[in-house]
Design a protein with these regions (language model features):
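C-terminal hydrophobic structural anchor segments
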Residues: 381-384, 532-536
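Short aromatic/basic micro-patch
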Residues: 460-463, 510, 528, 575
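Short hydrophobic beta-strand motif reused across regulatory alpha/beta modules
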Residues: 509-516, 574-582
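The conserved cystathionine-beta-synthase
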Residues: 477-495, 500-501, 520-523, 527, ...
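Structural signal for short hydrophobic segments within the conserved structured cores
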Residues: 473-478, 533, 538-541
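Alpha-helical transmembrane segments and immediately membrane-proximal extracytoplasmic
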Residues: 1-463, 467-473, 477-498, 502-508, ...
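Short beta-strands and strand-coil junctions in structured, solvent-facing domains, enriched
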Residues: 507, 561-562, 572
Length: 595
């Protein structure tokens, strides 16, 4: 009874909103609520993670060397795996890739558990020291909220995808208090088509997320940036150098991530993965405590110049007093952070690479400035180079230069740094993109053919379900049929095209009635000629596994108006008409181009 009553209210609400407000106003109103829910989820997760870390650090002995670091990560990964496998019973993934796949494969539809499952799993992983970030799980959470709200209101695929993007925008805006960057993220990373109809809902969600974050978390930012120094033209060569360096470190990041994922993938037993990953991660964190968790506290130590604090709980603390040893440890942190991140996710932890890219970039930028100052006698501003390094690695790993530029510019309130950020991000991107075609989020999707593209033509050809326009009504006849039997088929058919099947019901050839008119009217040949003698072999087939691009290329190459569709085993499926293909393609483009 209650369920029916609630369903009736929902139906009435949907009808009222669409009739009284119109679809555009409905989307704007829903984007506001998505902004509230997405931002609230991000705020809750941030607080839960900090509470978990505070509980662990305050409950257990605070010795000079904290050996509990050996145990925390493995406990976190075990709890995460139990939660995902026993409670959620579904693959949660690490966030952005799942969102991208849903946009491309399922019209922006995400499962309802994604509204909370990533929140819990990422809190367990990161709170217990997993060397990953919360941002990607929050993107998935916000996106799932938008997607499921769209489902509730029976919105079409285009508007579902838009509300999905609004959810991710709200979550990112709430985390960093950076609304412009959050919108750029939705466009550049989630590959949302920017239209006038899409921009306003994104603005509403981004603004709502930022305001809520300011309301509940105050003006404090994730990164404690006191002040930046003005941009000095003479430092451009160092920013160029930093761009090149962050570019190659981004390539290392992507390839090391891929390599470690591959190694863990070969391990079939989840218990062995957890054991190896947990022990390895714990040992790395014990030696280099800066690897614990997201790493924003370590970045803040760099920004304040308190580098020694990074090694306070490490067995290596005494060695860090020597400046050259400090450099060595900082370089180790840059390279080992990537390994720690890959091990965390590969062993079963849930988290993203957003925070790790900022971490690696910050340490890279600090090293460039410190080496130039200490050994070469320059006076480079550490803070500026830390920020530029963060933008450089993020740009290279995510292949998202605009997102990285606007993030650092907004969180540092330093648009005076725009030129250095642009130089570093662009050069890093240019170093990576010729070598690594896909970003950390899109590689696996591209390998499986699930990747959306900003090229509308290619997107349409991949997205459209061509099976629905296959013509299954072409008459088939056996290969040993006589001309007499062929004429009987002709009398019953409205088509002038026929398919010939062999003894095993496999595709053998085609019969075009116009090619045989002289024989059809010659009754003396009726029992002498077989269709085997008359049929032709098409010069080209469309296979059921062909992509939209391959199919269209075959039509253009052969100049045929109709082509048979078969399997690689020559099982006959039907016919595709070039006219229907182009008509469906035009309708799809028109639907996705409307404002």
């Amino acid at each position: 009874m209650r369920k029916k009553f609630g369903s009736s209210i929902l139906v009435c609400s949907r009808r009222w909103m669409k009739q009284k407000l119109g679809i555009q106003a409905t989307i704007l109103l829903l984007s506001f609520f998505v902004g509230i829910f997405g931002a609230t989820a991000a705020i809750i997760v941030k607080n839960l993670m900090h509470l978990t870390v505070s509980f662990l650090t305050n409950t257990f002995p605070n010795a000079q060397v904290n050996y509990y670091y050996l145990a925390f990560p493995i406990i976190g990964i075990v709890l995460t795996v139990i939660y995902t496998r026993r409670i959620v019973k579904d693959h949660i993934g690490h966030g952005v890739s799942i969102v991208l796949k849903s946009i491309f494969k399922s019209e922006g539809k995400l499962r309802s558990h994604n509204m909370y499952s990533s929140m819990v799993a990422s809190t367990l992983t990161v709170g217990f020291g997993g060397s990953v970030g919360l941002e990607a799980p929050m993107v998935l959470t916000g996106s799932a909220i938008g997607s499921n709200l769209a489902k509730l209101f029976n919105l079409n695929a285009k508007n579902t995808t838009l509300l999905l993007a609004c959810g991710s925008t709200a979550a990112v805006a709430a985390i960093f208090k950076a609304p412009i960057m959050a919108i750029v993220f939705a466009i550049e990373v989630l590959m949302l088509d920017l239209t006038s109809a899409a921009l306003l809902p994104l603005l509403i969600s981004a603004a709502t997320g930022t305001v809520l974050s300011l309301l509940f978390l105050g003006n404090t930012l994730t990164l404690d940036i006191a002040s930046t120094q003005s941009f000095f033209l003479g430092n451009i060569p160092f920013y160029i150098l930093l761009g090149i360096l962050t570019g190659f470190i981004s390539i290392y990041f992507l390839r090391m991530l891929r390599m470690i994922e591959g190694l863990f993938h070969k391990i079939k037993r989840i218990s062995v993965k957890i054991l190896i990953g947990g022990v390895a991660l714990g040992a790395l964190i014990l030696l280099l405590p800066a690897l614990f968790g997201e790493g924003y506290e370590s970045i803040n130590s760099l920004l304040k110049g308190d580098v020694a604090d990074l090694f306070e709980k490490s067995p290596l603390f005494m060695l860090s007093h020597e400046h050259y040893m400090l450099f060595i440890f900082l370089i180790l942190i840059v390279f080992i952070k990537v390994i720690a991140t890959a091990v965390t996710t590969s062993a079963g932890g849930i988290g993203g690479v957003f925070a790790p890219t900022l971490f690696v970039g910050a340490f890279t930028g600090f090293l460039v400035a410190d080496i130039a100052n200490y050994y070469l006698g320059f006076n480079l501003p550490h803070i500026n180079f830390v920020l530029a390094g963060m933008a450089g690695v993020m740009s290279g790993v995510m292949l998202a230069p605009l997102t990285s530029i606007f993030l650092i510019a907004e969180i540092s309130a330093g648009y005076s740094l725009l030129i250095p950020l642009m130089i570093t991000s662009l050069i890093s991107y240019l170093c990576v993109s010729p070598i690594e075609k896909y970003s950390v989020y899109t590689r696996q999707l591209a390998e499986k053919g699930h990747l959306k593209t900003h090229n509308k033509d290619k997107f349409a050809l991949k997205k459209i379900n061509w099976n629905r326009i296959i013509d299954h009504n072409i008459t088939t006849l056996p290969i040993h049929s006589t001309l007499r039997e062929y004429t009987q088929y002709i009398a019953k058919s409205k088509r002038n095209l026929f398919v010939v099947l062999d003894e095993n019901k496999k595709f053998a050839g085609l019969l075009v009635m116009d090619d045989h008119r002289d024989k059809i009217f010659n009754q003396e040949l009726y029992d002498k000629v077989l269709v085997d003698d008359l049929m032709i072999e098409p010069e080209e087939f469309i296979y059921d596994t062909d992509s939209g691009e391959e199919m269209l290329e075959k039509f253009n190459r052969t100049q045929n108006f109709n082509m048979p569709v078969i399997t690689h085993e020559r099982d006959y499926i039907g016919f595709l008409s070039k006219a229907k293909v182009l008509n469906l393609y035009r309708n799809f483009i028109a639907a996705y181009s409307e404002d």
